[in-house]
Amino acid sequence: MQSGQALVTQRPFRAPHHTVSDAGLLGGNINPTPGEISLAHHGVLFLDELPEFKRNVLETMRQPLEEGSVTISRAAGSMTFPSAFMLVAAMNPTPDGKMPGESSSSQREIQNYLSRISGPLLDRIDLHAEVPQVKFQEITAKRDGEPSAAIRERVIAARQRQEQRFDGSVRVTCNARMQARDIKQHCPLADEPKNLLRMAMNELNLSCLLYTSDA
């Protein structure tokens, strides 16, 4: 390895199975070792079939998602690992994977399935996207999609803008790590969007955490 060369040159991508334990996700064992959230540091942690993960395992991510680190305490002492990762999750709308109007699951079963993910954890996921059912004509239609290379260039450009915005700050490295004071500095709201956000807070009973994320 040459002088000044980084040990890791690519952002990690981790996709643990839904049977992972809390020690496997956060880290642990007798001699504390990093878990999946630390192995995904500065990269992506992808959780597929999110409601299939044990609820107590998912809940352990709440504090690391906010703080960007996790502390493992054992009898011999404690150790803090970095865990500033991007959480990407996917799930079906119903237990059998069908759309709500076509599912054979009862309303109670669907509600129990969705309630496996707590509100506080959902508050820590900044973007939610509902994917509609794709029709056969859309699947078979001949049309060119945007190439991955073009998307990659947009992502790189966005990252570079964020690096310039925060001017080498150790505490804030990207938009997701901004706190309330950073948002006020870099993303001041005009009166109209501020009023819209106030209405949403009142109508939807949004939490303070969601207010900061949406602002």
Feature-to-residue mapping (PLM):
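Conserved alpha-helical scaffold flanking the Walker A/P-loop in AAA+ ATPase domains
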Residues: A23-V44
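Short, flexible hinge/linker loops that cap or flank conserved catalytic cores
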Residues: H17, N31, I37-S38, M79-F81
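Short clusters of hydrophobic/aromatic residues that line enzyme substrate/ligand-binding pockets
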Residues: F13, L25-L26, I37, V70-I72
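Walker B catalytic acidic pair
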Residues: E49
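Short, basic, glycine/proline-bearing loop/turn elements
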Residues: T19-A23, G101-E102
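Basic, amphipathic alpha-helical bundle interface domains used for macromolecular binding and assembly
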Residues: P32, N56-S213
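AAA+/P-loop NTPase substrate/partner-engagement loops
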Residues: M1-S21
